[in-house]
Amino acid sequence: MMNPLVIKLGGVLLDSEEALERLFTALVTYREKHERPLVIMHGGGCLVDELMKRLALPVVKKNGLRVTPADQIDIITGALAGTANKTLLAWAVKHQINAVGLCLADGNTVTVTLLDAELGHVGKAQPGSAALVQTLLAAGYMPIISSIGITVEGQLMNVNADQAATALAATLGADLILLSDVSGILDGKGQRIAEMTAQKAEQLIAQGIITDGMVVKVNAALDAARSLGRPVDIASWRHSEQLPALFNGVPIGTRISV
């Protein structure tokens, strides 16, 4: 079997029917022409923010990571492993893609430990066992995996989806694409940077050009490139006509290498 490709979905993708239609059409196009197995990894930050607002609960972030108190983890699990995961599964069904909805803990695919007590139920992701996902891929299924994990003590954990995707790609020996709202990393003038190294990223973070959630995204991509020993792509799902080429290794956003 060819090396799988992990596609991490982020941004407002889950909120936009048009975006989901474009993405799944691109997935179908790719799967028709290529043998390479695909694995979808997702978070659902926008969905969680919306739910928090409806329930009048505060959203607190620390260094771009969501603080998850004990009284919110059940709600976040429901939003990510429930609504977000099954929404994506529904789109797969609609496009005749055989898919399976999972979380990080299924088959111990990604191991999760407590990241920082101050962040509450926020987990640190590390590579786990590839057995379950490889079995599904060999049988022709496309796994759709949420960023909810479980510690060995049985605690539910919210994991940053970029970091979860990195651990998943490491588990599977897979390439990784981080799909989001932006067409890659932008310079001070809003222009896309095609190639990015760790040195260049540190420079742009120090200059305040890369900020907030994008710092987490860039660091996740750099961590991924380091641990996987191969470049990682950050790209936008908005350019749907270019997605099959991206899935086939053509850089359309920012390619990050160490």
UniProtKB/Swiss-Prot annotation:
Matching SUPFAM superfamilies: Carbamate kinase-like
GO CC list: cytoplasm
Domain of life of the source: Bacteria
Keyword Chloroplast: no
Pathway recorded for this protein: Amino-acid biosynthesis; L-arginine biosynthesis; N(2)-acetyl-L-ornithine from L-glutamate: step 2/4
Entry's transmembrane regions: none
Annotated ATP binding sites: 181-186, 209-211
Complex and partners: Homodimer.
Similarity annotation: Belongs to the acetylglutamate kinase family. ArgB subfamily.
Name by which UniProt lists this protein: Acetylglutamate kinase
Organism for this UniProt entry: Yersinia pestis
